């Protein structure tokens, strides 16, 4: 397997890990369902998902103008404009942006996202929408720009650190490892002893030791039988690595 293929496989794996990590983080606790407006917004979202599922099953393309996601994106955005600053509005904002991504309207989503103030609570979930859009188009420039701004000016500390580590991951996915390193180091320094710092430390270790094309670290050991083994001894030979945990 040549280096180009290895790099491609590594890139695909990194992208999958990137999305899975962010999706895992997204499993935060939803707002308490004691607000009728939350129920109202959730009902709209449920109906949008139902109609979107029917649209997909019909074989229609996401970019078609009759995609119901477009209709519901408009409806949810209108709700946002009429009810600013509420928990329900934060959810409506995120879902409106997400539906535009699902309808392949990335530019329109970005235009609307630019109207969401950096101090809004909606960013706690809306960042995931930007990640999804970036992964779909394999274009991380907008995600980098927005998370960079949020990491500097967001009011909510959780949004701020989340934006910062997402910024590092976006740089990493784009292939700008030095910029990613700087972002991850900032997370470790500014948010010590947090899950985000632990994740950033793990990412830094991968950048340092596991990037394709890097020189493998030298080592010399003995087997359980007492035979010497060293890296140079494997040159030109097929090697099977077996890992196990205890």
Residue ranges and their predicted role:
Residues 79-90, 99-103, 112-126, 133-140, ...:
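Short solvent-exposed coil/turn linkers within tandem alpha-helical repeat scaffolds
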Residues 173, 179-222, 232-235:
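N-proximal helix/coil linker or "cap" segments that precede and/or mark the start of modular domains
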Residues 11-21:
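Bacterial N-terminal signal peptides
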Residues 26-74:
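N-terminal leader/linker segments that initiate helical-solenoid repeat arrays
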Residues 229-246:
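Short active-site neighborhood of thiol/selenol oxidoreductases, capturing the structured segment around
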């Amino acid at each position: 397997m040549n280096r180009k293929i290895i790099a491609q496989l590594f890139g695909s794996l990194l992208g999958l890990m990137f999305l899975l990590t962010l999706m895992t983080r997204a499993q935060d606790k939803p707002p308490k369902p004691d607000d009728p407006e939350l129920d109202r917004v959730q009902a709209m979202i449920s109906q949008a998902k139902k109609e979107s599922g029917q649209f997909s099953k019909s074989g229609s393309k996401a970019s078609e103008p009759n995609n119901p996601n477009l209709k519901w994106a408009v409806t949810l955005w209108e709700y946002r404009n009429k009810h600013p600053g509420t928990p329900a509005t934060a959810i409506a904002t995120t879902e409106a942006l997400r539906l535009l991504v699902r309808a392949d309207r990335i530019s329109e989503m970005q235009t609307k996202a630019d109207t969401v103030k950096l101090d809004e609570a909606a960013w706690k979930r809306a960042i995931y929408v930007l990640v999804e859009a970036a992964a779909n188009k394999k274009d991380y420039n907008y995600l980098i720009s927005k998370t960079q701004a949020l990491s500097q000016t967001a009011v909510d500390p959780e949004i701020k650190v989340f934006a910062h580590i997402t910024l590092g991951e976006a740089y990493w996915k784009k292939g700008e490892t030095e910029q990613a390193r700087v972002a991850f180091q900032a997370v470790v320094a500014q948010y010590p002893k947090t899950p985000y710092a632990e994740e950033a430390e793990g990412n830094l270790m991968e950048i340092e030791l596991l990037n394709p094309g890097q020189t493998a670290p030298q080592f010399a050991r003995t087997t359980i039988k007492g035979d010497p083994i060293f890296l140079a001894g494997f040159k030109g030979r097929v090697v099977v690595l077996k890992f196990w945990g205890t």
